């Protein structure tokens, strides 16, 4: 894996952990506090009183044991409905909340006893607050028994009616680990009923949204959660800034190094032109090149034929006093004495060929040619 990919994976994992920590704190059942809600009592003060706990967010709803523990810590118990009038009263409480779909736990639960032939399944259900009331509001085909031990009050406004009529506010046995809303009841007598905690069951709760809470409290809570999320995100991003800068600098350095390496590997487009010894004959009719061309032709002819006797090839130097009309400046092949003025020796007796460079005439050059046996071929001023 490349270092850049690994760094991105680590940053993503840290960011996800920080966001999860910012969304909510994991609570146990003992952390749930219902004292912020106002109980509803008959006539305002008469006992028993009730609290209808409804969660707008379905992920915050509680299972049966969690709901029972929350009511107990608030000084109550899961509701026991002892008469039809009390059933109607609780239905009105729920209707005033205008909640959406979501069943409510009530304090009815089946005892963990083996069912005998003489004992019906529904006779095994009892109230968790110790009430001995035999009032029941089961739906037509309930209870179904089996693995469904705890009891809920149906609240599914969007559900169509079943074979036994509407489901609304009817009772149904359900699995105790299901997440639902619940109703607490506060009576004059508060019998100490030991709570049965579900063994080996992990509880993850968040602070519930009670129906009695005002919009201002909700806004404050939302603002607090948003601020905590922003702080957690800042704590994650600020330490990661040096790593991001290091990654950017490393990327830029690698890019510059690769560009320079590619530039060095590319061939140089400029090529040097190779000049031939002899200039091109099509360069023009410059008077300065006529002497050069004549010597070249004479050299080629001289090399092509066999010469039994070598002789010096000279040309007459045009005098500066002669005019163009009476000076032909023709080239003559003749053997002369090197000491004579007006001639420049081009070829020595020992070389046997004509070279392609012309010295300017001077007595010093004449003496050098006589001693070395040949004349160096360079053209001055060309």
Curated annotation (Swiss-Prot):
Cell compartment(s), UniProt: Membrane
Map the sequence repeats onto residue numbers. Answer: 340-344, 350-354, 356-359, 371-375, 377-380
- SUPFAM superfamilies the UniProt entry points to: C-type lectin-like
User: Principal localization?
Assistant: membrane
Q: Does the keyword Transcription regulation apply?
A: no
Covalent S-S links between cysteines: 71-184, 150-176
Q: How does it sit in the membrane?
A: Single-pass type I membrane protein
- Pfam families given for it? Lectin_C (PF00059)
Q: Which portions of the sequence form the region Disordered?
A: 266-285
Which parts of the sequence lie on the Extracellular side of the lipid bilayer? 22-235
Spans annotated as 3 X 5 AA repeats of E-S-G-X-V: 340-375
Which Gene Ontology terms cover its molecular function?
Answer: carbohydrate binding; hyaluronic acid binding
- What does its UniProt record remark on the domains? The C-terminal domain interacts with the N-terminal domain of RDX.
Query: What is the role of this chain?
Result: Receptor for hyaluronate.
Listed name of the protein:
Layilin
**Organism of provenance:** Homo sapiens
């Amino acid at each position: 894996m490349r270092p850049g990919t690994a760094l991105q994976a680590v940053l993503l994992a840290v960011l996800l952990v920080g966001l999860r920590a910012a969304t909510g704190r994991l609570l146990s059942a003992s952390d749930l506090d219902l004292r912020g809600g106002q109980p509803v009592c008959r006539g305002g003060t008469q006992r028993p009183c009730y609290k209808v706990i409804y969660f707008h967010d379905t992920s915050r709803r509680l299972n049966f044991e969690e709901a029972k523990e929350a009511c107990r810590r608030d000084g109550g118990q899961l509701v026991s409905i002892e008469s039809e009038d009390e059933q109607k009263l609780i239905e009105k409480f729920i209707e005033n909340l205008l909640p959406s779909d979501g069943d409510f736990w009530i304090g009815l639960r089946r005892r963990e006893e083996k069912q005998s032939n003489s004992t019906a399944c529904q006779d095994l259900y009892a109230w968790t607050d110790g009430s001995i009331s035999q009032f029941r509001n089961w739906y037509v085909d309930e209870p179904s028994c089996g693995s469904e031990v705890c009891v809920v009050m149906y609240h599914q406004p969007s559900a169509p009616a079943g074979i036994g009529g509407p489901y609304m506010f009817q009772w149904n046995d359900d699995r105790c680990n299901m997440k639902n809303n619940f109703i607490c009841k506060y009576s004059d007598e508060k019998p100490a009923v030991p709570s049965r905690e579900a063994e080996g069951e992990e509880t993850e709760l968040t602070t519930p949204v009670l129906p009695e809470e005002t919009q201002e409290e909700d806004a404050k809570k939302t603002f607090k959660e948003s601020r905590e999320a922003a702080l957690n995100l800042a704590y994650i991003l600020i330490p990661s800034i040096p790593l991001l800068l290091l990654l950017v600098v490393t990327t830029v350095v690698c890019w510059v190094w690769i560009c320079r390496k590619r530039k060095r590997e590319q061939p140089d487009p400029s090529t040097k032109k190779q000049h031939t010894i002899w200039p091109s004959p099509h360069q023009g009719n410059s008077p300065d090149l006529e002497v050069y061309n004549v010597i070249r032709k004479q050299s080629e002819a001289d090399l092509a034929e066999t010469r039994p006797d070598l002789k010096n090839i000279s040309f007459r130097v045009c005098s500066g006093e002669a005019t163009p009309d009476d000076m032909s400046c023709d080239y003559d092949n003749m053997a002369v004495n090197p000491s004579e003025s007006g001639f420049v020796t081009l070829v020595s007796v020992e070389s046997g060929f004509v070279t392609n460079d012309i010295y300017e005439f001077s007595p010093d050059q004449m003496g050098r040619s006589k001693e070395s046996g040949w004349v160096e071929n360079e053209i001055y001023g060309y």
